């Protein structure tokens, strides 16, 4: 015997369903009875997307990607302003991007990183974190650039591969940044490695203290992706189980309204058999993945455990491949997780790999908060 009350409880539907349909929730439902289930209210959420221009000009492809995404973004995150040991900044080429974001109602997040020659440098970070004089110069330069751009609302720190002995110094650095930038009208945020416990070992994790960072910044972006990565064995890039495990640990240390879930906008094509240290997997967009499946008449399957699509094919040279990527189903599963955990929103790495379904799903699920 099925009661309307059972449906309400099972699907977390609003109790007004009873009034709308004029039914006693404690009475059995008749076979064939039609129920009107109103759409759930959209959740307010923030969305950030990194964009990484390289070379001497922003490519037409990246300009198009920014135009496509910005109507559904809170922040277009310019990746990245690389810190130098004297406190100066190596700025990316950004011409046209602030205007595209501003015209669509999005603002700019300046991403400040410890990248050096395309690698995160722990020693570069140490030089910055150990000198308040250099930090003062750095903060002055960040402020000057933010004012020049004119549409910046957030200063976003992406310091990775930090030496373990710099954990406290990094917290103090972020605290000082907040003291400098908040009076000027900016928020500060930080990208954090995906941890599942406070004492998680490893050079990417040890200096990222969730609790302490969460206390001194306005929000964090958890990099919940790259379980499947170019140099590793084939698997989903962001399987929902490990992603949720990271988020649930984070919620024990950081308020939900300060947490952005990280989400990849790409997949990988692995040549089989996988050999550790051998050929790297090819990164490709969800759109390219579906085109490739069509090209090779491959059947796209869906892994319910990982909540991710994949397919296998044999190329023209007889080599076997497996492709893991994202689609509307996998993104909807992540959006459901964001809503269930009441998180601040989602941060994407990175624009430039077409995935139009993602932006449509944002519109269906959320009200994008603007800053």
Where are these regions (language model features)?
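Primarily a LysM-type cell-wall glycan-binding module
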Residues: 1-12
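Loop/turn positions that initiate beta-strands
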Residues: 29-35
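Glycan-recognition patch characteristic of GH18 chitinases/ENGases
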Residues: 40-141
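Short, acidic/polar
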Residues: 54-70, 132-148, 202-211, 326-339
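Conserved, mostly hydrophobic/aromatic
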Residues: 76, 157, 220, 261, ...
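Active-site groove signature of glycoside hydrolases
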Residues: 77-80, 137-169, 219-233
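Substrate-binding surface in catalytic domains of secreted glycosidases
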Residues: 85-92, 166-295
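Glycan-binding loop/region signatures in secreted carbohydrate-active enzymes
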Residues: 118, 265-334, 358, 366-371
């Amino acid at each position: 015997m099925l009661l309307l009350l059972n449906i309400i409880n099972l699907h977390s539907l609003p109790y007004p369903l009873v009034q709308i349909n004029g039914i006693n929730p404690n009475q059995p439902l008749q076979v064939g009875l039609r129920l009107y289930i109103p759409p759930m209210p959209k959740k307010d959420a923030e969305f950030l997307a990194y964009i990484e221009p390289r070379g001497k000009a922003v490519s037409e492809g990246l300009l198009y990607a920014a135009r496509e995404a910005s109507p559904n973004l809170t922040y277009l995150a310019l990746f990245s302003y690389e810190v130098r040991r004297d406190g100066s900044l190596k700025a990316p080429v950004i011409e046209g991007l602030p205007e595209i974001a501003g015209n669509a109602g999005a603002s700019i997040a300046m991403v400040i990183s410890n990248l050096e020659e395309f690698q995160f440098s722990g020693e570069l970070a140490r030089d910055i974190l150990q000198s308040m004089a250099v930090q003062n110069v750095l903060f002055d330069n960040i402020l000057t650039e933010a004012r020049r751009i004119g549409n910046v609302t957030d200063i976003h720190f992406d310091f990775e591969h930090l030496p373990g002995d710099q954990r406290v110094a990094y917290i103090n650095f972020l605290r000082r940044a907040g003291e400098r930038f908040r009076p000027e009208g900016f928020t500060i945020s930080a990208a954090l490695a995906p941890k599942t416990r406070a004492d998680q070992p490893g050079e990417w994790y040890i200096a990222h203290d969730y609790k302490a960072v969460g206390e001194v910044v306005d929000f964090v972006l958890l990099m919940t992706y790259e379980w499947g990565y170019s140099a590793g064995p084939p698997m989903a890039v962001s399987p929902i189980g490990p992603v949720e495990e990271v988020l649930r640990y984070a919620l024990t240390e950081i308020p939900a309204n300060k947490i952005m879930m990280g989400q990849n906008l790409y997949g990988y094509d692995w040549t089989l058999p996988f050999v550790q240290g051998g050929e790297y997997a090819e990164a490709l967009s969800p759109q390219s993945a579906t085109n490739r499946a069509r090209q090779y008449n491959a059947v796209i399957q869906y892994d319910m455990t990982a909540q991710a699509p994949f397919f296998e094919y044999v190329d023209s040279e007889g080599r076997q491949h497996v492709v893991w990527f994202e689609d509307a189903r996998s993104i909807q599963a992540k959006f459901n997780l964001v809503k269930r955990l009441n998180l601040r929103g989602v941060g994407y790495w990175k624009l430039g790999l077409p995935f139009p379904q993602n932006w449509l799903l944002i519109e269906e699920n959320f009200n994008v908060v603007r800053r």
